[in-house]
Amino acid sequence: MFHSLSVKNFILIDELEIEFTNGLCVITGETGAGKSILLDAILFCLGYKTSSAGIIKHGKDYAAVNIVFSLNDEIKNFLTQNFIELEESLLIKCVQKAEGRKNFFINNQVVNKAIMQQLATYLFELHGQNNNISLLEINTQRDILDSFGDLLELRMQLAKCYQAWQNIRNEIAEIALKQNSIEQEIDYLNFVTEELIKLNVQTGEEEQLTNIRKDLQNKDKDLQLIKDIFEQVNNPEINSSISKAEKLLAKQSQNEEFANISTNLEEAYNNLEEARQNLSNLLENFNKLDYNLEEIEERLFAIKAISRKYNVSADALKTFLEESLNRLNSLKGKIANQAELQVQEAKLSTEYYKLGKDLSGKRLAAAKRLEEVLHHELKQLKMEKATFHVNIAERKEAAAYGIDDIVFKASTNPGMSPEAINKIASGGELSRFMLALKTSLFNKMVKPAIIFDEIDVGIGGEVADKVGERLKKLSSATQVIVITHQPQVAGKADLHIKIEKTQLEKETKVTVKALNLAERQQELARMISGKAITEASLKAAKELLCHPVA
């Protein structure tokens, strides 16, 4: 519900703040007093077109409107989905600068006009001389009938079935449309996956092989060095020279010094043999290496080539293979499951039309009940000559909401054939049609507030009293705000707001005030007799306040 409305520098208003209550709130004032300004302020704040062109009060550089609204689960979900922080209440604000720029805020966060207008659909309905757009929309008429007939749950079940059916149909159509391209992609993916599986590149393999290649290149240098050394120490002349020297020394074996030299030569020979053996072992170990530089080079070349071919890094080739296999299996599955999808499509189609016919039959029954209830309500509103008919025709194509096209038709004069309600009813009549519908549905109200703008134009007396009764009844289910000229309606209010226009020397001002009981009696008396308030009008006003509901 609306908690409060704050307005500053708006049209003829300097500054005001109104606190609303639950129930029935009426707004009254003399003709031309500016009762529509409050409605314009609400529309302005929520991003809708207003009836007034000049929004900013003359001499001011900006206009601002603030609305505080209570929260419900739907509003909370909307705010959460749009990343708007939740507060204890819903705070809505719009500021327009003199240069024309307009800024919208929800809970002090800047939002665009589209978000603000979407939010408005969760807050209230507006019905008046030029604002019965919702009643004229086919979607709204369908919602009214289904809500009245308690058919929303069945319709939701139908919508889920329809969505599943359409998903299957779209999948079948996609396969049929892309049969050739799917088969071509399967051929391509078969080639890709076979090539990748054959090469079997592992994550980190390129780096590992690069390091091994570097080691092998260094070992090649070591191998050449060992071969050169081995060639030198394995020279037969070295052994021959040592042998000759030892034979010469043997002739002088009695000489201790020569004996020591002979020992040294023997040790040199042994050390040389050991060096030869060590070098031979090194050469043998090199020949036993697991890695071959030429093979490593070939493997690295193959990895780099396939990486370039598919524009994928070497480490990502394994993931690329997995993705390609998944895509390949998915496409093969689509082809293989085409027959199965067609079976599912037929099953869902049968289920949809079964639910659709069930919903259609229940809509026909609900339509008859709604027509009866509405005719009763229209009689209460002194529209005895009006007729109302819910036209239900079978659709040519299935839809999420069913197999029916639903149009509200009416006639307001005898002898007239019923036509679409927007073609035959005036603004006031549309408002009373909507009031009759809302009264019929008052236990199923979903919007926190309803605003009626001059719903009682062109009526009076008993009709106005009946309109007031219906508004009062409706206000027991949701907050109702009414701009009215009728004392019979105003007398039933839980909150009575009066708007006055004052002509000063240099400007015109509009003031807004919530009336107490005595002030309400004076205002009702004025509404009854005009500016010249009489004892009779005061008495009648008191009677209306004492007996607000007949």
UniProtKB/Swiss-Prot annotation:
What's an example GO cellular component term for this entry?
bacterial nucleoid
The GO annotation for biological process reads: DNA recombination; DNA repair; SOS response
- Identify the keywords attached in UniProt to this record, alphabetized: ATP-binding, DNA damage, DNA repair, Nucleotide-binding
**Residues the entry annotates as binding ATP:** G29, E30, T31, G32, A33, G34, K35, S36
Q: Which domain of life is it from?
A: Bacteria
Spell out the coiled coil positions from the record: none
Q: Give any GO molecular function from the UniProt entry.
A: ATP binding
* Alphabetical list of CDD domains matching this protein: ABC_RecN (cd03241)
Summarizing the function annotation, the protein's role is: May be involved in recombinational repair of damaged DNA.
- Family indicated by similarity: Belongs to the RecN family.
Name of the molecule in the record: DNA repair protein RecN
State the organism named in the record: Rickettsia bellii (strain RML369-C)
| Lineage, broadest ranks | Bacteria, Pseudomonadati, Pseudomonadota, Alphaproteobacteria, Rickettsiales
Protein's gene: recN
